[in-house]
Amino acid sequence: SDNLAQAVGENLAEIACQVVEQVFGFLSQISAQQQQFESEHTVEQITATIAKHLPWSMQLLNHERLSSLMHDLGHMMSFTDGQIWLKYPIPAHLAMQLRQYSHNLNSSHDIAQAFSLIVEIIDQGVTQLVRDPKKKLKFNFMVDKSLAGVIGLTTQLGYKRLEKMGKQLNPEQAQAYLEHFLQFIPQKKLRIKL
């Protein structure tokens, strides 16, 4: 059971790191050198934290709770066009607003608003993919508080980086990032390729 929990934890950490790379990796490509360094540093901090804490937390689960977690995660995955996708529903108005901003980035205010929407959409996923499952797993008080702290720290690192980029990117760079991000939102679900 420990070997299974370790393997599950490592695989979940790998999936989580892929998600972070897909969300933030493109920012590094379109940014100025200093912004690129900051984005890469943020990604490294987040992925290192995930790689450290996710396998550890999974080792604390018995087989029944581990099976329940994997069952729920399986419902959030799909296989389309030869690719495995992780998906979660988002409110239609968020996707619509982001699409509108992607066609109308006329000012720094518009860019900042668009990046705030991206943070809101990502936070929907953090809740559905991380916070809600953590609650269902019913960790003991100390582990629960530790994980809540890790989740809070990593999300704030990512969100602050996105909000800062929303203030630093020019309209062309912001447009490129929005188009990159919108490719993950085909309808009312955000999909991330694994």
Question: In which residue ranges do the predicted regions lie?
Answer:
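Protein-protein interaction and targeting regions used for scaffolding, dimerization, and localization
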Residues: 1-194
